[in-house]
């Protein structure tokens, strides 16, 4: 009998930039594409950080919604977890994306 597991992926993280890791997915489409690859390989939970166009960390609810919609479309059943972390951002900004009702948040 096998033991069920949850494999979590955090495709972007809060700190790295493309200059640190050229393959880092920072745009919405890159994040969706790389998350889909992980889903196809067996991942079942995606921990999401979003970025502004200049690659700085963001709490923009619209960016979170776009990534969430793409994951739901291309990775059916995958658990979507939004990051509410936000170095230097106020609490309201850090939780603004929760309006989009992810499966989880941390």
Regions found by a protein language model. Name each.
Residues 1-23:
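N-terminal small/glycine-rich loop or linker at the start of catalytic domains
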Residues 23-32, 62:
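Glycine-rich anion/phosphate-binding loops
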Residues 10-14, 51-53, 83-87:
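Active-site beta-loop-alpha junctions enriched in small/polar residues
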Residues 40-43, 77, 102:
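A structural motif
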Residues 3, 9, 56-82:
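Alpha-helix-loop-beta-strand connector modules within alpha/beta enzyme cores
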Residues 31, 38, 49, 105:
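Conserved, mostly hydrophobic/aromatic
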Residues 19, 44-67:
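Glycine-rich, proline-tolerant flexible connector loops at the mouths of alpha/beta enzymes
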Residues 88-106:
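Extended substrate/RNA-proximal surfaces in nucleic-acid metabolism proteins
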């Amino acid at each position: 009998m096998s033991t069920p597991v949850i494999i979590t992926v955090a495709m972007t993280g809060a700190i790295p930039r493309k200059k640190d890791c050229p393959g880092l997915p920072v745009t919405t489409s890159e994040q969706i594409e790389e998350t889909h690859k992980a889903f196809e390989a067996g991942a079942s939970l995606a921990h999401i950080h979003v970025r502004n166009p200049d690659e700085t960390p963001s709490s923009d609810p619209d960016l979170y919604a776009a990534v969430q919609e793409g994951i739901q479309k291309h990775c059916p059943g995958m658990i979507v977890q939004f990051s509410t972390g936000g170095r230097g951002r106020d609490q309201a900004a850090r939780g603004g994306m929760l309006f989009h009702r992810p499966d989880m948040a941390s």
